[in-house]
UniProtKB/Swiss-Prot annotation:
Keyword rRNA processing among UniProt keywords: no
Name listed for the protein in its UniProt record: Transcription factor E
Function: Transcription factor that plays a role in the activation of archaeal genes transcribed by RNA polymerase. Facilitates transcription initiation by enhancing TATA-box recognition by TATA-box-binding protein (Tbp), and transcription factor B (Tfb) and RNA polymerase recruitment. Not absolutely required for transcription in vitro, but particularly important in cases where Tbp or Tfb function is not optimal. It dynamically alters the nucleic acid-binding properties of RNA polymerases by stabilizing the initiation complex and destabilizing elongation complexes.
One Gene Ontology biological process: transcription initiation at RNA polymerase II promoter
Family per record: Belongs to the TFE family.
Complex formation: Monomer. Interaction with RNA polymerase subunits RpoF and RpoE is necessary for Tfe stimulatory transcription activity. Able to interact with Tbp and RNA polymerase in the absence of DNA promoter. Interacts both with the preinitiation and elongation complexes.
Organism: Methanosarcina barkeri (strain Fusaro / DSM 804)
Underlying gene: tfe
MF terms in GO: DNA binding
Length: 164
C-alpha cells in the first residue's frame, strides 16, 4: 500500500478524488472486493465509491476484473488498488506543472499590464489601449501594474521544482 502520510502523495490523491475518495482509499480492504463491499467497509456512499474507483482506474491506480455468475449470468466487478506506478505519475504531474509555470513566467515577463485600482480587471497593454485605459467594468482609470514581485515568485517556484 502507498504511504498516505506522505504530504505529496496525499495531496495528489486528494486533488484526484477529494476527501471522501481519500477516506475510501485509507479504509479500503485488501484484495479484490466489490464496490458494495467497499462502501460497506469504508462507510463512504456507493456513488462516491464508484466515482472514486473510476477516477483511480483512469489514472491506473485501480484494477478492475469482471466475473460472470454462472447461475444468474450477472457480472460482478472486483476492484483492487495498485499504487505501484504512483512515483511515475507524480513525475508526470511535476513536469506538467513545471511546463505550465514556465509558460506563465514567460507570459508575465514578456507583457505589460494595466489594472483597475478597484481590482476589477488586469489587462494587457494592447487591451488597455483598446479601452482607452478605462476599466471596462467600472470606468476607473487603469494604472500600470508592476508584476515584478509575481515574476520573482514564479521564478523561485520554477527553480525549486527544477532542482527537486
Amino acid at each position: 500500500m502507498v504511504d498516505l502520510n506522505d504530504k505529496v502523495i496525499r495531496g495528489y490523491l486528494l486533488s484526484l478524488v477529494g476527501e471522501d475518495g481519500l477516506q475510501m482509499i485509507e479504509k479500503m480492504p485488501e484484495g479484490e472486493v466489490t464496490d458494495e463491499e467497499i462502501a460497506a467497509k469504508t462507510e463512504v456512499l456507493l456513488n462516491t465509491v464508484r466515482r472514486t474507483l473510476f477516477i483511480l482506474n483512469e489514472n491506473k491506480f485501480a484494477i478492475c476484473r469482471r466475473e460472470r455468475d454462472s447461475n444468474s449470468g450477472w457480472l460482478t466487478y472486483l476492484w483492487r488498488l495498485d499504487f505501484s506506478d504512483i512515483e511515475h505519475q507524480l513525475m508526470k504531474e511535476k513536469k506538467k506543472l513545471l511546463r505550465n509555470l514556465k509558460t506563465r513566467l514567460e507570459f508575465e515577463e514578456n507583457n505589460v499590464f494595466y489594472m483597475c485600482p478597484q481590482g476589477c480587471v488586469r489587462l494587457l497593454f494592447d487591451e488597455a489601449t483598446e479601452t482607452e485605459f478605462l476599466c471596462p467594468m467600472c470606468g476607473e482609470d487603469l494604472v500600470f501594474y508592476d508584476n515584478s514581485h509575481f515574476i520573482d515568485v514564479l521564478r523561485k517556484r520554477v527553480d525549486a521544482l527544477s532542482s527537486a
